[in-house]
Amino acid sequence: MALFSVPTPVTTILLDIEGTTTPITFVKDVLFPYIKENIKKYLLEHWQEKECQEDITQLQKQAEKDSHIDGFVPIPSAISDNETENMIQAVVDNVYWQMSLDRKTTALKQLQGHMWRSAYITGQLKGEVYEDVVPSIRQWRELGFKLYIYSSGSVEAQKLLFGFSIEGNLLKLLDGHFDTTVGHKVESKSYRNIADSIRCSPENILFLTDVVKDMPLYLVTQESYPEAVIRGVCC
């Protein structure tokens, strides 16, 4: 992480994950390939489970919203057991399509999170963090800062990454997690929602990310919204 001085008003630090706490290569070269290589096997093994069916329902709803997009992949409903295999293949194709566009829909992230959970628990995956992340977080905590994670990955996926990391269980060092259910990172309202949720004034929050486009920079010019909450630190 880049060395920097935390502005005086800041009491809370909001951390992005990909490229900030965790190498981008871990997501691109480990997590995403795991989904592509194992999704069909996972669906076949868990198809009858309630959680899996809820994931499919959410993906179907998302597919309906995406029907206007060029090249979208529909997910039909299985009318009979004989059609289950076709439906599973449709889900696989839809997930592949969404991932090819680097989409971050809540439905996709939910299914991915459940797949990663299984892999973390069985030891197939270990969450990666940069070597300076844990020392930095410990130092910030000693200085009295509150620490939260805000990422496009689901809260469950975040907890798995930090709970089963190469540095051990890091969840005790974090005060909470936020994902796209509060809004996307490019939307100013998302940061207001987070501030309201943790009962903290926006000017007391510092958002650290390596991706400038994730920050609604136009807000800097708006006196009604403080710069601190959208400040980024390149890592």
From Swiss-Prot:
One of its GO terms (biological process) is L-methionine salvage from methylthioadenosine. It is found in: Cytoplasm; Nucleus. GO terms for molecular function: acireductone synthase activity; magnesium ion binding. Its EC number is 3.1.3.77. Its main location: cytoplasm. It catalyses: 5-methylsulfanyl-2,3-dioxopentyl phosphate + H2O = 1,2-dihydroxy-5-(methylsulfanyl)pent-1-en-3-one + phosphate. Binds 1 Mg(2+) ion per subunit. InterPro entries: Enolase-ppase_E1 (IPR023943), ENOPH1_eukaryotes (IPR027511), HAD-like_sf (IPR036412), HAD_sf (IPR023214). Pathway: Amino-acid biosynthesis; L-methionine biosynthesis via salvage pathway; L-methionine from S-methyl-5-thio-alpha-D-ribose 1-phosphate: step 3/6; Amino-acid biosynthesis; L-methionine biosynthesis via salvage pathway; L-methionine from S-methyl-5-thio-alpha-D-ribose 1-phosphate: step 4/6. Its cofactor is Mg(2+). Pfam families: Hydrolase. GO terms for cellular component: cytoplasm; nucleus. Mg(2+) binds at residues 16, 18, 210. Keywords: Amino-acid biosynthesis, Cytoplasm, Hydrolase, Magnesium, Metal-binding, Methionine biosynthesis, Nucleus. Substrate binds at residues 151-152, 185. PANTHER family: ENOLASE-PHOSPHATASE E1 (PTHR20371:SF1). Bifunctional enzyme that catalyzes the enolization of 2,3-diketo-5-methylthiopentyl-1-phosphate (DK-MTP-1-P) into the intermediate 2-hydroxy-3-keto-5-methylthiopentenyl-1-phosphate (HK-MTPenyl-1-P), which is then dephosphorylated to form the acireductone 1,2-dihydroxy-3-keto-5-methylthiopentene (DHK-MTPene). Belongs to the HAD-like hydrolase superfamily. MasA/MtnC family. Monomer. This is Enolase-phosphatase E1. The lineage of its organism: Eukaryota, Metazoa, Chordata, Craniata, Vertebrata.
